[in-house]
UniProtKB/Swiss-Prot annotation:
Upper taxonomic lineage: Eukaryota, Metazoa, Chordata, Craniata, Vertebrata
Highest taxon of source: Eukaryota
Main location: secreted
Gene designation: IL4
Protein name per UniProt: Interleukin-4
Record flagged with keyword Glycoprotein: yes
Disulfide bonds: C48-C88, C70-C115
Length: 143
């Protein structure tokens, strides 16, 4: 009185499809949260967003999306270290909290791999976050 092979195959397919759907939903929710957090920081318009950060979101020929997000996470991670947090961000704890949340969310989407952020060019945090928002929106639309 066991399962027929056909029924077992159908049940296995349903299980796999359900798992893929759930993972896709989690990923989409994560992307929406990241975009929402980026919007929150960009709307605040504090002087803190005029600070300079490495311009790591410049895509070159060999740059993958995963590589860009790895470098973006490295830039955002610097806001975790108290000695690297500027006085402006210390006085705007809401912005600092969102930047830390962004770092966690992005690193959850793409677990950390080894990447370098040594770039001679700088950009404002505001421009960096705006470009990061564009990348996240493209990922969200591509599904």
């Amino acid at each position: 009185m066991g399962l027929s092979p056909q029924l077992a195959a159908v049940l296995l397919c349903l299980l796999v499809c359900t798992g893929n759907y759930a993972r896709r939903q989690d990923r989409e929710a994560g992307l929406r949260e990241i975009i929402h957090n980026l919007d929150q920081v960009l709307k605040k318009e504090t002087p803190c967003t005029e600070m300079f950060v490495p311009d790591v979101l410049i895509a070159t020929k060999n740059t993958t999306e995963k590589g860009l997000l790895c470098r973006a996470t490295r830039v955002l991670r610097k806001f975790y270290f108290p000695r690297e947090v500027t006085p402006c961000l210390k006085n705007n704890s809401g912005v600092l909290s969102i930047l830390r949340k962004l770092c966690r969310s992005i690193s959850t989407l793409h677990p950390q791999e080894s990447c370098s952020v040594s770039t001679p060019t700088l950009t404002t945090l505001n421009d960096f976050l705006g470009r990061l928002r564009g990348i996240m929106q493209m990922k969200n639309w591509q599904g």
